[in-house]
């Protein structure tokens, strides 16, 4: 048995083109508002740190910075720079979504679902990276803790978490439902 795709008329491709354009536009908007995005990321980091630590946390959103350990002897601040933000880790997910939307428009709902889940995973991975840095600074001290937390373990968390998020996205976007598996059998 051979599967043949029916030709799609220009009128019915318009929503598809708009969806692809919307996903690409979301990527452009994220790049344009990355500073505001970083401020939100720092606010989220501050909220998480307030829950997991009692040593005092202050967020300077306008400086994209979070300070912790304020009640101790060695308070420390982290500034969220563009390369440390999850905003640029979201861009590959948006590009893959746009490409898959273009070539597999019938999977639009599944693609948007997988984009949402994977985007949340990327954001949480970056928060885990920040928590790793904070934990190591608290445990090993400022110099060694920051070195190990930011340079080595933080980078590993980002790379491995980003890869897992991308694999999760592709798996969610391309897997078949039970009904599709039964129909194919």
Where are the regions that the model predicts?
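Hydrophobic N-terminal alpha-helices or hydrophobic patches in metabolic proteins across all domains
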Residues: 1-185
């Amino acid at each position: 048995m051979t599967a043949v795709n029916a030709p799609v008329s220009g009128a019915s491709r318009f929503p598809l083109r708009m969806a692809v354009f919307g996903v690409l536009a979301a990527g452009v908007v994220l790049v344009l508002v990355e500073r505001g995005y970083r401020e939100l990321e720092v606010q989220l980091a501050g909220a998480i740190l307030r829950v997991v630590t009692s040593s005092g946390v202050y967020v300077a959103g306008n400086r994209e910075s979070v300070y912790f350990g304020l009640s101790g002897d060695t308070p420390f601040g982290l500034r969220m720079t563009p390369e440390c933000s999850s905003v640029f880790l979201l861009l590959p997910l948006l590009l893959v979504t746009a490409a898959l939307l273009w070539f597999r428009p019938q999977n639009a709902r599944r693609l948007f679902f997988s984009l949402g889940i994977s985007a949340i995973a990327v954001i949480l991975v970056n928060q885990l990276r920040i928590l790793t840095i904070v934990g190591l600074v608290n445990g090993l001290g400022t110099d060694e803790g920051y070195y190990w937390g930011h340079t080595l373990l933080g980078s590993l968390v980002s790379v491995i978490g980003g890869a897992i998020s991308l694999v999760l996205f592709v798996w969610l976007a391309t897997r078949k439902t039970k009904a599709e598996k039964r129909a194919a059998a």
